[in-house]
A protein has these predicted regions:
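Short, conserved structural patches
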Residues: 63, 67, 71-189
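Alpha-helical assembly-interface signal, strongest on the long, hydrophobic N-terminal helix that forms
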Residues: 2-104
Length: 189
């Protein structure tokens, strides 16, 4: 079995021939590894942008939920004065799970365009495109961002493909008001 190999090694120029034949193989391997590095970098960019978008959305939602709470609490205080009774508005709102879910739903639906605009601004500022917003997946606002994938080899095979990344904002108390439910999803398409 190795006799033929020994005979092959004795000829002049065979090592050079093997290198010339192996160079395209090495080039394909290195381009494949380079494409993996590109995917890894694109994923990092998408996650960074999604984190920025989720932080911006959380900051906006803090204001919207606070405004909704103040509206409901002032209405309860006004009803207290009219009925000459006293109901603690804070306890009334926090003790009613249906009312809390309604606050979240109305805060998202009434301000959806502003939230989309804010998330889009921060995600695009960080080099990605926004994809979706999930409200209160695990008590947090989750943003999904995507980056167009441009591989080093087989570019036509990966045309219109994206690398996605997810970012999570901080946990908020009002995020738990939407527990045991499917997260509210807002899409950018």
């Amino acid at each position: 079995m190795f006799r033929g190999l020994r005979k092959f090694n004795r000829k002049r120029g065979n090592v050079t021939l093997m290198w010339v034949v192996a160079l395209p193989v090495f080039m394909i391997i290195f381009m494949f590894l380079g494409s993996l590095v590109v995917v890894w970098m694109d994923h990092a960019i998408a996650e960074k942008a999604a984190d920025a978008g989720s932080l911006a959305a959380t900051k906006k939602m803090d204001g919207y939920v606070s405004a909704e709470l103040q509206t409901i609490m002032s209405r309860i205080l006004q009803e207290n004065a009219e009925n000459q009774t006293f109901v603690d508005p804070y306890q009334y709102v926090l003790g009613n799970s249906g009312l809390k879910r309604g606050i979240i739903k109305s805060a998202v639906r009434n301000n959806e365009e502003e939230l989309i605009k804010e998330v889009r601004k921060y995600v695009e500022q960080n080099g990605a495109e926004p994809s979706k917003i999930y409200f209160f997946a695990d008590g947090r606002i989750q943003v999904e961002a995507k980056v167009k994938f441009t591989p080093l080899i087989w570019a036509e095979e990966f045309a219109n493909k994206y690398v996605k990344g997810k970012g999570f904002g901080p946990t908020r108390d009002y995020g738990s008001w939407w527990s045991n439910r499917k997260p509210l999803e807002v899409s950018f398409e």
